[in-house]
Amino acid sequence: MTSYTFSRELRLLTPAQFKSVFSNPIKASSAEITLLAIPNTEQHPRMGLTVAKRFVKRANQRNRIKRVIRDSFRLNQHDIPHLDIVVLVRNGVMEMENAEINKLIEKLWRKLSRRYNG
């Protein structure tokens, strides 16, 4: 049975793991969200997430955005190649509804997969 959890093994946890993604990444971006990725040696993708206070002032809004992105990753993890991915949230995402964020991030998952595969 396919698991749709977002367990600890699917997360980037240490600063070193985040830093490695920033060196020569594969990119997929929109005006509001940027995905940076590098191939990993695991049998599954891993994700790290940053939402800066500079762009999203209120904690409840940052948490909402992170929750929507994590949920999208959780549901799409089996369609994403074995990559370490860092999601950077930029200005403008705060005005978006949850459904809009979800639609945008799913489009970016597909774009990232295409760039990695060919």
From Swiss-Prot:
Keyword Nuclease tagged: yes
EC category name: hydrolase
Transmembrane domains' residue ranges: none
Signal peptide location: none
Presence of the UniProt keyword Protein transport in the record: no
GO terms (BP aspect): tRNA 5'-leader removal
E.C. number: 3.1.26.5
UniProt catalytic activity: Endonucleolytic cleavage of RNA, removing 5'-extranucleotides from tRNA precursor
Family the entry assigns: Belongs to the RnpA family.
Function: RNaseP catalyzes the removal of the 5'-leader sequence from pre-tRNA to produce the mature 5'-terminus. It can also cleave other RNA substrates such as 4.5S RNA. The protein component plays an auxiliary but essential role in vivo by binding to the 5'-leader sequence and broadening the substrate specificity of the ribozyme.
Quaternary structure (record): Consists of a catalytic RNA component (M1 or rnpB) and a protein subunit.
Name recorded for this polypeptide: Ribonuclease P protein component
Species annotation: Shewanella baltica (strain OS155 / ATCC BAA-1091)
